[in-house]
Structure formats: C-alpha cells, structure tokens
Amino acid sequence: MWGICIPAVCSSTAVSKLTKVMYESATLSSIPSDVTVKHCQEAGERTPYSTGFYIFIVLVLSLIATAVGSTYYRKHVPAAEQSTNYLIKIITKSFCMNNNQEDLTKVNKDEIHVLNGIRFLTSAIVISMHVIFYMSVAGISNLLDVDEFLEGVGGLLLHFDLFVDTFFTMSGLLHIKSLMKRRQSLLGVLWKRYIRLIGPFALIVFYLISVSKHYSPGPAWIGVDETDICEKHWVKSLLMMNSDVRHICHAVTWYLPCDYQLTILGTLLFFFYQRNRSFGFVSYAIVAAFSIVIPGTLTYLYQFPGVLFSEYGKYVIRYRDTWEISLIYTPFYSRASTYLVGVAMGYFMCIYKPNDYRKSVSKKWSIIGVAVSFIIMAATMSLGYVFKQRQYDPVEAVVVAATNRIFWAAAICCIIGMCEYGNVPIVSEILNWPVFTPLSRLSYGIYMIHPIIVQRHKLAQRSPHTFDTFCMVYDGFAILTMSIGLSYAMWLFVEAPLINITNQLFFDKSKEKEPNKSRNENGQGHQNGVTKNNVSLNKIELYKRNYENRIQHQNGVPKTKIL
C-alpha cells in the first residue's frame, strides 16, 4: 500500500500521475504501472452521523439496561411479589445475567469435553491467521521477508484454511448427536440453529453499516468496502443465502451460510434415516460421494491448484475480486465432506456412548492413534508448501482437492475418539481443562467479533505494516483477549437472551398441560367397576403378604430372609 499527501484541489487524474511517479521511483521499477484512485480522504473530513448510528447506540444501551434491570428484579424482588405477566416473566428470565452466567459455565450431561478445548484453540489459531490476512490486505513493507518466511517453515501455513474445517467437523458431530438424542421437530431444530447464529451476526452487520465508518479512519479501511457491501447485500446475508465472496457482508462470515446449509443437509439425511434406515444410509453414501466428486471435478475443469492458497498473493490480497473462491472455497459443497465425517463420528458416539465405553481402548493404542492423527494433520497441512514448490499436475490437484479435507476431519475425529474412549495422558488433560468450557461457548462470538478488532487495528494505519513474528504473536494475543471480553458482553446482552426467549416461546415444555391430579387423587378413574387406587392398593397388600409368608427352597434347604 502506498499513500501520498497532496493539496485537496488536485483531481483524481493528478493523484494517479503523482502516485505512479512515486511508485516507480521508490521501487526503482521499470515496469509500467497503472494507478486507479478509488477514494481520496480529505484532511478534517467527517462523515455525518446517520439515523442508523443513533438507532444502534440506543439498541445497545437498551439491551444493557434490560439485562441490568432484569438481574436486579430477579435477585432482589421476592418470588411471591414478582409479576405474573407472561411477557415480563420471559424478558426478566431471559435477560438475567446471573442465569446467563451460570449457563456459560454449566457442564451438561453427556457433554464431549474435549470439544471445548478443540473449539477454543482453533478459534485462537484462526485469529492469528486473520491477523496475517488483514496485514496482507493493508500492505506489508518488507515483502522479501514474507517470501522468505513462506519458503521456509511458514509454507506449512499456506493450507491454513483447514483449521476452519475443524469447526465443520464438530458441527456435523454435534448436530447428528443432538438429533438422535431425543425425538423432536426437525423444523424446530433448524429454527433454533438459525436463532443461535443470527443474533450476533445481525448486530455485527448493523455495526458495519451504521457505525464502523465513523470509527475506522484510514485509506486502507475505505478500500475494503465493507460498509457499501453490507448496505447492498445484508438481507441475503442474514437469510444465510450468501456464499459469493464479492457480496459477503464481513469477510469471515462466509462460514455462517455454509454451516447453516450443511445443517439443513444433515437434517434432511436424518429425516431419510428416520423414515427408512437403509434409505438413510444409502442417501448418506450418495451425498458423501458427491462431496468428493464435485471439488475434484471443479478443480480439473478450471485447473485450480490442489490447495487454493498455495498461490497466496493471488487469492488473499485481492480476495473479493477472485471468483475462484466463490466457486471452490465458500460454497457448502466444498465443505460437505468434512461435515459428513463429523456426522459419521456423531452417529458412532450415539450408538456407542462414551460413558458406557470409557477406557475401552488401551493406553498404548490411544497414544498411537493420537500420534498418527497429528502426523496426518501435519502432512495435510504441508500440502500447500508442497504444491508451491512443484509444477502443476492436474491429477495431483484433483486427488488432493477431493480428499485432503477428509483426512483432516478424520484425524480430528480420531483425536476426539481416543480421548473419549481411550487414555491419552497429556492431550486429553489439556483439552479437558475446565477453563475451556466457558471459552468454548464464547467461541462463536469471538469468531464474529475479532475481525472488527483486527480491521480497526490494521486498516487504520497510514503506512505499510512490518512483517515480524513477535509483533504478530503480540497482536494475536491482544486481539484474542479483547475478543473474549467483547464476546462475553455479547453473550450476556444478545446471544443468551435471544436463545432463552426463543426457547421460552417455542420450546417451553412447562407450558404443556399437566395431567388432572384431582382425578387420580379422588379415585374417580374406574377399572372394571373398581377405582384404580383401590386396585393398586390391593395389589400392594397382596404382594407384601406373599413376600412375608413365602418360603423359597434351594437344593431342599429353606432360604430364610436376611434382615
């Protein structure tokens, strides 16, 4: 990125010519350049506050006030004196911060504890990757150091997108596990999943449209066009229908429609399984085959590299202008194989419940299984570096594109399985650390919030960034810490209340009619002309008399009752 300060009276044509001269002289380049001016930021220029800005501020303050008021009301007002109004009960119960705090730390029955550690650690890694991503978008001054890094150990990170496949694997596992746990409305399941995703997403979209332009100065931010894209395509994004990278509101949110569409696919497969077990398995096999064939076919037809980001500069720096991403990276069919591996693991864990088969795999084989999984993950991750060093081979590209995500997902599932069914000393203890339980539940908020922090930090600078490992690690930890704090606030004021309200309105089992107790208590139900209560009492008395008087013999010796 290059910046130049000139008098405000200069036209865009003049700016283009001056920038061209500056670029060619600074880089000592003889390559002809063509500079396009998208925006000139004028000193002292301020964007007027819109109505949406004030609505956003009022909305946030209202949510906070409602949460504080509900917490005080439920804590200090005696239950006998609390209002019986149904709406007030729902609001105060849903927004009570004490209840939401307990939900954040509560350990659920049959919870797969290792998933908490995997989910949070994956979120932390994704944040680190996005720090580098937005640095590249904003501009790096020492690009030779970047090239040297990618030629060395950094080349292992060229397939960094595999970390996102960990989320899809866990999503498939948990979704099928939830469906098989109890009988429930499948449409209700999809609705709950949508509500779970939409709350934080809608608030972030509202922020990007109405507020971000006032707090994100700098030419780099203007060039990202987040605000304009959100204003044009926010409806499609909120409906989980947007997988086109040119129209995605907030770059990292491509994950949401992809995940939700896969949730619909998983629910449909489960519906087939409910109707006919064999047809369900056949449907799963067909979809799994297509999830392998489609990425491989597209890679062959369009001659994509086996690992898309092995050509880092082409597919990252100008990601919105790269049509290949919308065809092979963000659509649900490109991640279906990973999701289906998770579905298979979830089905296995429902049939063979970990609580019933704990430590059934020996320590030796558990360690071997985890070690092999880590080796497979490292080998799969290194494919980006391998493809960067080799000439393009269409057969290799097709095979890798079709199968590499499956190996990654299978390795993740193997680690989960060995920790749940076996005995893995260090890995299991780390992933089962209790601190990961609340952090895992904040991971969705962390994922949604952290790009805003990274953008504000990286794109507000008016000079190119310096690529330095220590600085990136420092930025990663700082952004992770801020994201956790803001995600905690998002949970208390937005995410948990919205989930609670939905459960109260649509899935509250306490609203179901209770059986008529007076009927049973008064003995009005008759059976063959005799009240049911009398029949039950007669049976109990008869059983007691038989038990007291009977003498059981074994081998001719009476068996006495031991008191």
Label every model-predicted segment.
Residues 57-63, 115-122, 152, 161-164, ...:
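Transmembrane alpha-helical segments and their boundary/interface "anchor" motifs
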